[in-house]
Amino acid sequence: MMKDWNLNLYDELVFCGYGEPTERLDDLLTIARKVKATTHLKIRINTNGLSDLINGKPTAPLLKGVIDSVSVSLNECSAEEYNALCHPKFGPDAYDAMLQFTKDVKNYVPHVAMSVVGVIPRDHIEKCRDIAAELKVPFRVR
């Protein structure tokens, strides 16, 4: 199917959207490897950071050499606020797993950042900015 697309018209391929791209991690990696081998494109994943919980194993090492950047949706400044906003199917373990994934993926992917949506309270945004700074990753309000 990809042979019909002129991917050279683009600079970056982003795996994101309504739903979590790492729910289909094997497919994501297969496509990313093929794109990497046949184009100049940079490859980014926009993720909720719950890939390890979703896949039942550490997943950050699988991204090495395949993914150029990862943007993790931090979403909130505490586990309680995160759970209230996101309702993760993994319950109270989700927030810490997302933070751990962010720490881990920095060892395998050249560019890692965190983001929040600008509709949460300003003081929460600033706390999120501090969390990203503690993790030594760029922070963006979207």
Labelled PLM ranges:
Residues M1-V66, S78:
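Conserved Radical SAM active-site core
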Residues P21-T22, G49-L53, V72-K89, P121:
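Conserved radical SAM core fold
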Residues L28, M98, I125:
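Aromatic/hydrophobic pocket-lining residues that form the small-molecule binding cavity
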Residues L29-T39, T102-P110, R129, A133:
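Surface-exposed amphipathic alpha-helices with a cationic face
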Residues V66-S78, R140-R142:
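Non-cysteine beta-strand/loop elements that form the S-adenosyl-L-methionine
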